[in-house]
């Protein structure tokens, strides 16, 4: 079955890439974003990376649900793929087992972090908007986004829901790289341009100031268009946001800084993501989103 999955995944990725490229899917948005931030994004390479990761999600996702729980078992090889944990990440992952806030982005194979973290014994909870029809949503929640019989997908919408998740000692996951178009969005900068920031992390830290904040991502070492998938090493990175940058009771009582200075997303997460994008802009899939629409809508009408 693993061999068949490899063949089907490779075939699907090629077909999906060809179809989307021919249709020019999101091409104008990608180019508008790239021009706005003066970033050398290769539309074809980005699309090839995106379809490859989508095919792995559809046909190879089960591999991540087989990964070992013990940190000492890494590096390991499962279903022909090699997995490892980055140097210095184990203590952070151990702390994540006690819960907190987990920030990540549409970067690389970001969906695969869900089952991997769950297999490591981390009580991950990720909020997703339910999809329709209901039977498809049930498949997503109970089959795809479930590990060892536990779904890590929840439909949390209110502040009370989010605080309850933290109170239960869960690790709350939030994709924090999208344009926030709600009235409470915070002003900030991203890739040198004005951009709205998701206010949720800062809201949670205001009410639970001792909550640790983590950032995780998967690095594919040896990844290149000519590198076989089986020869890549998938490395899990985990870092903790510096406590000095997180809202504390003392800081909350002091004169209020500007929104961009006080935002943990703007001051820490965006800087981390900018570094990842500089390393490889063709792995940040939010180039296909209108990330700067709230601040600069005109760039998407040219």
Question: What do the predicted segments below correspond to?
Answer:
Residues 1-104, 139-141:
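Membrane-anchoring hydrophobic helices of lipid-metabolizing enzymes
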Residues 1-4, 109-114, 165-175:
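Short, composition-biased local secondary-structure segments
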Residues 18, 33, 116, 142-143, ...:
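Generic structural signal for isolated residues within well-ordered alpha-helices
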Residues 27-29, 132-134, 194-198:
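Active-site metal-coordination segments of metallo-dependent hydrolases
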Residues 29, 112, 139, 199-203, ...:
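Short Gly/charged-rich anion-binding patches and loops
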Residues 36-37, 42-45, 94-95, 99, ...:
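Non-catalytic C-terminal accessory region of glycerolipid acyltransferases
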Residues 79-86, 107, 133, 152-156, ...:
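A conditional alpha-helix N-cap/helix-loop micro-motif detector
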Residues 96-156, 182-184, 189, 227-228:
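Catalytic core of membrane glycerolipid acyltransferases/transacylases, capturing the structured
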């Amino acid at each position: 079955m693993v061999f068949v999955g490899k063949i089907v995944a490779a075939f699907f990725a090629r077909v999906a890439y060809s179809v989307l490229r021919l249709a020019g899917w999101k091409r104008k948005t990608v180019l508008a974003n790239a021009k706005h931030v003066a970033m050398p994004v290769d539309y074809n390479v980005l699309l090839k990376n995106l379809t490859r990761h989508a095919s792995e999600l559809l046909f190879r996702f089960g591999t991540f649900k087989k990964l070992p729980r013990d940190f000492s078992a890494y590096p390991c090889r499962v279903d022909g793929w090699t997995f490892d944990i980055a140097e210095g990440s184990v203590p952070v992952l151990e702390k994540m087992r006690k819960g907190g806030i987990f920030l990540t982005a549409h970067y690389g194979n970001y969906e695969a972090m869900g089952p991997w973290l769950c297999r490591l014994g981390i009580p991950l909870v990720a909020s997703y908007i339910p999809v329709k029809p209901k039977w498809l949503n049930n498949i997503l929640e109970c089959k795809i986004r479930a590990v060892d019989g536990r779904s890590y997908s929840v439909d949390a919408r209110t502040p009370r829901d989010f605080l309850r998740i933290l109170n239960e000692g869960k690790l709350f996951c939030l994709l924090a790289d999208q344009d926030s178009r709600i009235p409470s969005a915070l002003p900030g900068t991203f890739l040198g341009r004005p951009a709205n920031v998701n206010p949720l992390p800062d809201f949670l830290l205001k009410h639970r100031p001792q909550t640790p904040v983590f950032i995780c991502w998967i690095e594919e070492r040896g990844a290149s268009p000519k590198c076989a998938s089986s020869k890549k090493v998938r490395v899990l990175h985990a870092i903790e946001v510096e406590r000095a940058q997180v809202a504390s009771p003392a800081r909350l009582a002091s004169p209020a800084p500007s929104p961009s200075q006080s935002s943990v997303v703007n001051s820490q997460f965006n800087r981390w993501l900018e570094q990842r994008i500089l390393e490889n802009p063709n792995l940040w899939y939010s180039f296909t989103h209108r990330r700067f629409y709230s601040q600069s809508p005109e760039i998407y009408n040219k």
